A protein has these predicted regions:
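Conserved alpha/beta-hydrolase
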Residues: 43-61
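Conserved alpha/beta-hydrolase "acid-adjacent" motif
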Residues: 199-205
Length: 255
């Protein structure tokens, strides 16, 4: 139950560009490398970009078990506050559990962002093991094999842990109902990108988010050629270009 020594893709990324800031949030138990190509695209578009490494990630899965959803929320909150102080407009983007954190930020700090971009966000699960076994399993085993690299494109390797840290995963499962209950507080314009085939997050999550937020402006884009880690898959370029178009749209007139 070991993971390889972290290498490229496991460190935070920061770039100071223009007056529009973009916060990118990776998933669980992933790493910034899953969003690095997206970050590079945003840099070329002229934006200020922050892509933090969430606590307990990018090292060993054992470290993740010493952290919680609240710790990760604290990290991205600090990044949001830093961008808000530096930039005239901020857009927050997240993949998978990074989308969960994005939604939580939108619930807590609605005035701090001009829009949000979600790629395969999670707010619940239909899996019975996550619902009923995690509360007990966290006292029995430290980790179990996870689905890493759910990518349709061959020979693409996602940076992240091959094992799911159970205690950390339990805190995610506890956060889901909190985030979902407060989805009506989300009013920011939203770009929702979701894979039609996803072996990690059930597609119903995207429908729940779309139906339960209060955002008046929602752009819904299916990703028919990609699996869960769509930012590294066949539809990556669609994500990158559509996010820039969305950011331009929601920040026009604010600069």
């Amino acid at each position: 139950m070991t993971d390889p020594t972290p290498a490229q893709g496991y460190t935070a990324f920061s770039h100071d560009g223009g007056d529009v800031g973009v916060l990118l949030i990776h998933g669980f138990p992933g790493a910034p490398g899953s969003l690095q190509a997206w970050a590079d695209h945003l840099v070329r578009a002229g934006y200020t970009v922050r892509l933090p490494l969430l606590p307990g990630h990018g090292t060993r899965w054992q470290d993740a078990n010493r952290t919680t959803f609240a710790d990760w929320l604290g990290t991205v909150t600090a990044s949001l506050q830093e961008l808000s102080a530096r930039c005239r407009a901020v857009v927050v983007c997240g993949l998978s559990m990074g989308g969960t954190l994005t939604l939580r930020l939108a619930e807590l700090f609605p005035d701090a962002m001009s829009g949000i971009v979600l790629v395969n966000p999670s707010v619940m699960t239909l899996r019975k093991d996550a619902k009923y076994l995690l509360p007990v399993l966290r006292y029995v085993v430290p980790a179990y094999p996870g689905i890493v690299g759910d990518i349709a494109k061959p020979d693409v390797v996602e940076p992240g842990y091959k094992w799911i840290p159970v205690k950390a995963m339990y805190t995610v499962s506890r956060a889901w109902p909190v985030v979902r209950a407060e989805l009506p507080k989300v009013t920011a314009p939203m770009l929702l990108l979701h894979s039609t085939v996803d072996h990690v997050v059930e597609p119903v999550n995207a429908q729940i988010v779309r139906d339960e937020v209060s955002s008046q402006q929602i752009t819904d884009i299916p990703l028919p050629r990609s699996y869960h880690v769509a930012t590294m898959d066949y539809d990556a370029e669609l994500i990158f270009t559509s996010s820039v178009e969305f950011i331009e749209k929601v920040t026009v007139g604010l600069l």
